[in-house]
Regions:
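Intrinsically disordered, low-complexity, positively charged segments
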Residues: 1-5
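Extended alpha-helical interaction modules
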Residues: 7, 11-131
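Membrane-associated alpha-helical segments
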Residues: 117-209
């Protein structure tokens, strides 16, 4: 049964709850592993370009009525398990999982690209063979393409518009998972990758003109 939309939040046999996020992340609450696997298997036909290895984020959620809501380490303390609260938690967890994927991908490409960027800055020439260089350009462009839509990571979830009282919980979760800081770090590396691609393409074009 559907409990809410944007993000889609549904009941899972158990009973439990799952949210299906626009980033392609599923967040489970109180769902047994066997039910998680069954739920994901049900979604499999609808998936396109799934990652070979899933990125997993975990957060313990404790319900403590009457106490201030807080986040301490890997534990979130909330007043109740209202769907809106679960959606806020799911939003941050999904962003964190997506950032983890981006961080790994960007880090591996950045390590390959940085020497090229340094050499370009130092001499203005393209090192290495042209075939290898074109492979690097293709790899860099693919990284940028996979990052499309990343700006949405810093946006607040829509659920806060109708539930402004939950903004404090969102801000605490966002800070605990360092969403803004991690996003900024990725942006810096992507900017270097982008400028390097632009410079390389200009140099390659001038060589063939």
């Amino acid at each position: 049964d559907t409990l809410a939309n944007n993000p889609l939040t549904v009941e899972v046999k158990g009973p439990g709850v799952a949210t299906l996020n626009r980033y392609g992340v599923v967040v489970f609450f109180d769902v047994r592993p066997v039910e998680e696997m069954a739920f994901l298997a049900h979604l499999q036909p609808a998936l396109s370009n799934p990652y070979p290895t899933p990125e997993i984020e975990e957060l313990e959620v404790r319900i403590e009525p009457g106490n201030p809501e807080s986040v301490k380490g890997d534990v979130a303390y909330i007043e109740n398990a209202a769907v809106e609260r679960l959606q806020v938690i799911a939003d941050v967890l999904s962003k964190s999982a997506l950032l983890s994927l981006y961080e790994k991908k960007v880090a591996s490409e950045f390590d390959r690209i940085e020497p090229l960027a340094v050499e370009l800055d130092r001499s203005g020439y393209l090192p290495g063979q042209s075939k290898e260089l074109l492979k690097k350009i293709g790899s860099m462009l693919m990284v940028e393409q996979r990052m499309v839509g990343r700006a949405e990571i810093t946006e607040k979830p829509d659920v806060l518009w109708d539930n402004p009282s939950l903004e404090g919980l969102y801000v605490r979760l966002e800070g605990e998972f360092e969403i803004k800081e991690r996003h900024t770090a990725i942006e810096r590396k992507l900017n270097l990758i982008s400028s390097t691609v632009h410079t390389v393409l200009e140099l390659v074009s001038s060589k063939h003109s």
